[in-house]
């Protein structure tokens, strides 16, 4: 039946900041849905607090609210916009939980808003573990297959301890209700572990409910993606098999689509169970994902869980099959049925045809354990990966090897040279699942392990183990051959070996292997993803490489621009860079170019087949990019390759591309070197007469000590050429400097360590600007709230700046122009300054799109990334002003006085990591970046904007209750005024003895509490950590002492994370929070859409 006519406007809830377990895939699905709903003529209202997303661009929805996703704020938006319906299934767990709580509070009923896409009953049946158990039992009664693991529901610690007895002892699995990414879940092997995991699970579950179940470790794990409409048509979009057996969260496992090791009968059985479940739960206007465990010994099937919403797996399934689940879910939600929706890719077949694949897809996760040295790297049922890469091949080995090299991590590809090591040790290592387990398995095979031994140790299915043996046999053949002949080379390529691996095995250079390969005529062809195994013609060019016979790349007339994406998400290089690539693609298509996107990240908008004219789903290595350029050169004219938008990954390829004769447009490789290389950049600054903090480079401890002695401590030490501040540290004395140099393994004359003077108490400033060779456009000036020394990606910042005057902006503009000119930038540049005393120091310059571009663009209502792409291809700022792509006059440095103030706050993944003893990871910020995402708060005054940013990132600031203060000596003076403000707002202050003394002398009363190290008092007085755990503290201010992680502070901050109490670790954040608390208690906090803000800014500019 056709579209419903009673719905005129829809509110879509996004997923908020990127956290582990809920990443860019929801931006992809939300963007798809908003476009579809608007195309259907509905008014779309969107709420999402994350500015780095495409979906929060003003052109995607009719009214875009960058506001915290909390029931209070969403209610304000509903009251203002009065939508007819609410679609909550595209924003992950955040959106689902918000919608459910608004339904329960009666808000939806009060304003007459209908929930579409999933009804409350279906959501509860899918999410509530007890109800879902009932669903599985009902299905078993009907079709005779499928069961749940034996389990017990618990609401308290006593229930939990009894439950273990019922299930027959340890190990048991703990799973909380209504959480995502496996938060709070885990395997408990004894009582101590059980108390820890279940205690955290009860806290995290919004319904204080956990499920204990029998352990099914080592079983095979599968997933099905299904869709159902209200006429009861069901399609199975895709089957996915996990390479790792049960016990590793599916988001952390290598996964394969379609599933490889199921017999036809087993697959039909899973299908039958899946279809029966989606009917029983009652999902009738959308998609869902169901996870199964199969016992390899007797084939017993257990249904683990389902998600009645668009999930991480559905983004993967969409990219793997070309079947756009989110788009179709949005159409089903407004009344269409599957047989009425055409398949975009073939245009001939309806969405009720199930996709069939004539290729294999492998997804590999990307981790960031190097950022949290104390974290436990064992993989469990709690998701820990921060990103993923996907690859497509004609067989499993090709897809697997391509996926591993797409991860761009040292040591992620299989290596076949050097001694493998001891077989017994390697097999023992492979028992514990970690992010490098597949490499340990390969080394064990090289050391002589048998397939049976590998299976015993890892429980990885024998078929997969056999495939690993196949790869190893080919490597042996490559090593033993007299010379590389075309047959052997082609065979190696068909199994996914890269030129780098072949060169390593043969003891040659990569470029020599490539020359031989080209001379022998061994080159890849490109195949199309067409959803139907080539039964119908595909209308959308979505390619993957393979060493096959015929190429499917069609010739074209228009000049092509190849945009290199940013690869898998990781800390320091996330969705913000994808945002710039997508914008470039839109802008260049409009300007008449054929846009070609190269990327391997399945979560993103850039790898959607309708973002660019052609999409290559390929690894971002030199070899793969050169082959794509070659294929596109044969198809028609190539204007050039853009490397400045995808972060550090494509930037690192620019020189090599140029050396291979590929035109790099925009900022040339020489300019990138001038900004990245310390010596060259120092020269640019010297010529422009700009001060930088005193610095030097060293390759030994003696050299570093000499520099530090001359500059004076504290110093900032870091390796060269890194993104996200990897390996940076503030060093306060000589002994720590010595151990830092000793721990840094990668020091060499070509990669020295940089030693800078560290500016204490300086204001850090970030500038994003455009330069076309003649004119500078200042995009925005951001003032950091935390002091210099905290990585800019982790610091909160305000735009327009809140304490800088007109004169300061003039100086910033002149310095930025001098640097852009001196470096030779064409397009975007990001510069970090520090203001200490009255001197403006230059910290560093990045000749590329930075992670603040989306935030700056939204705060000033100017599409910077679009403008940068046009400048790369020769447009001038004057021309873009004439086209109104940039404002006709003024720029981000001359914003009107009543411009709204935007605050960006970083979101950290502390709660996901534990060390091996189960303790938390310390939450102190430093020069190494650790945040996974960001939120934005926007309002007419700073206090409210800051309060909104905190509510969006960590939950609302408290407006009453007890505040605990304990600060380092250097912070005691600056803490007095904010502390007095807190008392004025009616807070009761708690403090440790030293801080309480200073407060008392200044006339502020504070109750003294005991430190953790002092233990309980004689009368049973609790320590501060116990008070926090008992929920008796509402706000914590705790600044660390030097770099020594004094245990007191560590214990306090870890307790704060466990109980979700706001914890401020700098005095600057405290001062901002006080302004926020003030704004919350005095004013009525309103909401305005980005479109209203933009209208206001444009009117003021003209």
Curated annotation (Swiss-Prot):
Binding site for Mg(2+) 4: 844, 846
Region entry Carboxyphosphate synthetic domain, spans: 1-408
Residues engaged in binding Mn(2+) 3: 832, 844
Pathway: Amino-acid biosynthesis; L-arginine biosynthesis; carbamoyl phosphate from bicarbonate: step 1/1; Pyrimidine metabolism; UMP biosynthesis via de novo pathway; (S)-dihydroorotate from bicarbonate: step 1/3
Residues annotated to bind Mn(2+) 4: 844, 846
Cofactor binding comment, as recorded: Binds 4 Mg(2+) or Mn(2+) ions per subunit.
GO cellular component: cytoplasm
A Gene Ontology biological process term: 'de novo' UMP biosynthetic process
Gene3D superfamilies documented for this protein: 3.40.50.20, ATP-grasp fold, A domain (3.30.1490.20), ATP-grasp fold, B domain (3.30.470.20), Carbamoyl-phosphate synthetase, large subunit oligomerisation domain (1.10.1030.10), Methylglyoxal synthase-like domain (3.40.50.1380)
Superkingdom of the organism of origin: Bacteria
Subunit-level organization: Composed of two chains; the small (or glutamine) chain promotes the hydrolysis of glutamine to ammonia, which is used by the large (or ammonia) chain to synthesize carbamoyl phosphate. Tetramer of heterodimers (alpha,beta)4.
Residue ranges annotated for the ATP-grasp domain, each copy included: 138-334, 682-873
Binding site for ATP 1: 129, 175, 181-182, 214, 216, 221, 247-249, 291, 305
The protein's name in its UniProt record: Carbamoyl phosphate synthase large chain
Organism: Streptomyces avermitilis (strain ATCC 31267 / DSM 46492 / JCM 5070 / NBRC 14893 / NCIMB 12804 / NRRL 8165 / MA-4680)
SUPFAM superfamilies per record: Carbamoyl phosphate synthetase, large subunit connection domain (SSF48108), Glutathione synthetase ATP-binding domain-like (SSF56059), Methylglyoxal synthase-like (SSF52335), PreATP-grasp domain (SSF52440)
Keyword match Ligase: yes
